[in-house]
UniProtKB/Swiss-Prot annotation:
SUPFAM superfamilies: Class II aaRS and biotin synthetases (SSF55681), GAD domain-like (SSF55261), Nucleic acid-binding proteins (SSF50249). The lineage of its organism: Bacteria, Bacillati, Cyanobacteriota, Cyanophyceae, Synechococcales. The keyword rRNA-binding does not apply. It comes from the Bacteria. Homodimer. It comes from Prochlorococcus marinus (strain SARG / CCMP1375 / SS120). The gene is aspS. GO terms for cellular component: cytoplasm. Gene3D superfamilies: Bira Bifunctional Protein, Domain 2 (3.30.930.10), GAD-like domain (3.30.1360.30), Nucleic acid-binding proteins (2.40.50.140). This is Aspartate--tRNA(Asp/Asn) ligase. One of its GO terms (biological process) is aspartyl-tRNA aminoacylation.
């Protein structure tokens, strides 16, 4: 039906006869000559309809509406110099049409304009309700093309590194120690349920036991969890696993993979190896295990300096085993008012969202003098003040913000304020496409964290991460040493966002059982839930490890978008709904009966 794509035509095609198909982006009538901007997925080109080419052709063109689907034949010619459009790649040429056929008409009114000439914002709800129209817009076309380029580059790289692409099951079993599963009832096995995979974790480990050695998959994953801008109930992972590789070898190969993607998509040569931070160092310096290193304001622990000054908020936190930490805002005296820091202010509100009950602050004046509340100023001696200013690197005109309490809350508070103030003070362009790509690895995570609600340890990543061998010690000390051991786990962070992560895996069945016992799974339950894995580990499992990247998030960053919904063809809302198909939806009583399910939910009419 067509000989060329609209956006691929150039001056070299002048005098060529072409057949084009696409949508009418807009139509203009100028003094008896009709101009049509014809659009397909590659771009737009100007079509000229001259009445000299025939009255029937002209009549059809006169009645065209935007988004009508057409086929046009004609000859490419140069535009007059005064009418060239340098903003378009096809702006130096046009097609003089000699044939126009309407392939499909528009019925009714469009819910929003799709034209490349219309930049008026459209509500996301409307875009998602009519996603098939939104996909025609240049923004979405570019994002999906970019997504394709990322996948193509990743596949090519992994093929060259001798990886096999292997699919793992979508219908699997529900296992503990993860997010909430999406469950699927079995009609054949009455009363039993499948779960949709949260990741291919156990299957890719079994592939390593099976001797595949190097595996990858563009994996669909499902998690029934509360959503935000960078989360979806179903999402895509670039999933990788390999045998007989050390942690450093895995990180090195991953850096080459990421570098190949950035080079292909952005033309950027990334410098690697990427910096490494231990988990503890990241928490100490940034208050988070996903640090953004494009700006300063690093956390400083000033507990030792301030523990004896007589300010109950500080001393009480320290005496209770917590800490006092702070961040320094360069030039903050001029940039931030007291009103913003006190109750009711936006900075105070951000701190409250992280769990803080209050904020303290010091303004640094000339000659090392400070302004602060009396309870701090009156009890801070000269030596303490000098040491505080030295440790915080604070100078005249700077503002120091303090948080006190349990260390976890203090870290969350200052990490949140650090990110909020970086955006508020425009320390970095927050459109995320500023070409500043600060990659880093966070390594040496704790194996476990304490779940106070359930009064037990739980795996910080998952219970299949291998512990650091130097922390583990001899076999008889495993149960004693495991709770405080570090995991051989690693996360890749870019500009404050986690791109993905992984670990070396446990390949010793006894150690795996001990880890499951540590998180509170009795022997019989462990064998019931993970017996297939434990049995496989007894059959000569090789040392192995891997990682997974969130494809949607990578594309979001590369595209300069603020939500992964703009990188997915048919995303869900933050309520996990598809506005286009109105899923999820009720099913018939007959379907429920076949599945042996009775609903107890009473729907409000």
């Amino acid at each position: 039906m067509r000989s060329n794509y609209c956006g691929e035509l150039r001056k070299k095609h002048i005098n060529s006869n072409v057949q084009l198909c696409g949508w009418v982006d807009r139509r203009r009538d100028h003094g008896g000559v009709i101009f049509i901007d014809l659009r397909d997925r590659t771009g737009t080109i100007q079509i000229t309809i001259d009445p000299d080419q025939g009255s029937e052709l002209f009549t059809v063109a006169e009645n065209l509406r935007n988004e009508t689907v057409v086929q046009i034949s004609g000859t490419i010619r140069a535009r007059p110099s005064e009418s060239c459009n340098q903003k378009l790649k096809t702006g130096e040429i046009e097609v003089l049409a000699n044939h126009l056929e309407v392939l499909n008409q528009i019925q009714g009114n469009l819910p929003f304009s799709i034209s490349v000439h219309d930049d008026e914002p459209i509500k996301e709800e409307l875009r998602l309700r009519h996603r098939y129209l939104d996909l025609r817009k240049d923004r979405m076309t570019k994002n999906l093309r970019l997504r394709h380029e990322v996948l193509k580059t990743a596949r090519n790289f992994l093929e060259q590194e001798n990886f096999l692409e292997v699919e793992t099951p979508i219908l699997t079993r529900s296992t503990p120690e993860g997010a909430r599963d999406y469950l699927v009832p079995s009609r054949v096995c009455e009363g039993d349920w499948f779960a949709l995979p949260q990741s291919p974790q156990l299957f890719k480990q079994l592939l390593m036991v099976g001797g595949i050695e190097r595996y990858y998959q563009i994996a669909r994953c499902f998690r029934d969890e509360d959503l935000r801008s960078d989360r979806q109930p179903e999402f895509t992972q670039l999933d990788i696993e390999m045998s007989f590789m050390s942690q450093e070898e895995i990180l090195g190969l991953t850096e080459k993979l990421i570098s190949s993607i950035w080079k292909s998509v952005k033309g950027v040569d990334l410098v690697h190896p990427f910096p490494r931070l231990t988990w503890q160092e990241s928490m100490d310096r940034f208050g988070t295990d996903r640090p953004d290193t494009r700006y300063g304001m690093e956390l400083k622990n000033v507990s030792q300096i301030l523990k004896g000054i007589g300010f109950k908020v500080f001393s009480g936190a320290i005496d209770a085993g917590g800490s006092v930490k702070c961040i320094t805002i360069t030039g903050g005296n001029q940039l931030i008012s007291n009103v913003r820091i006190k109750p009711g202010g936006d900075i105070f509100s951000e701190a409250e969202k992280a769990g803080a009950k209050g904020l303290a602050f010091i303004r640094v004046r000339g000659n090392g003098e400070i302004d602060t509340i009396g309870a701090i100023k009156d009890n801070l001696n000269i030596a303490q003040k000098e040491e505080l200013l030295k440790q915080t690197n604070a100078n005249e005109g700077d503002l120091i913000l303090f948080a006190a309490g349990d260390t976890t809350t203090v870290n969350k508070t200052l990490a949140r304020l650090r990110q909020f103030l970086a955006k508020d003070l425009d320390l970095i362009p927050f459109k995320l496409n500023n070409e500043q790509w600060n990659f880093l690895w966070v390594v040496d995570f704790p194996m476990f964290e304490f779940n106070s609600d359930e009064n037990r340890l739980e795996a910080l990543h998952h219970p299949f991460c291998a512990p650091n061998q130097s922390d583990l010690g001899q076999r008889r000390l495993w149960e004693t040493n495991l709770p405080t051991a570090r995991a051989q786990a690693y996360d890749l962070v870019l500009n404050g966002l986690e791109l993905g992560g992984g670990s070396l895996r446990i390949h010793n069945p006894d150690l795996q059982l001990t880890v499951l016992k540590t998180i509170g799974l009795p022997l019989q339950e462990a064998k019931k839930e993970f017996g297939f894995l434990l049995e496989a580990l007894e059959m000569g499992a090789p040392p192995h490890g891997g990682l997974a990247f969130g494809l949607d998030r990578i594309v979001m960053l590369l595209a300069g978008e603020e939500s992964i919904r703009d990188t997915i063809a048919f995303p869900k809302t933050q309520q996990a709904k598809c506005l286009l198909t109105e899923a999820p939806a009720e099913v018939s009583k007959k379907q429920l009966k076949e599945l042996h399910i009775t609903s107890t939910f009473i729907k409000n009419e």
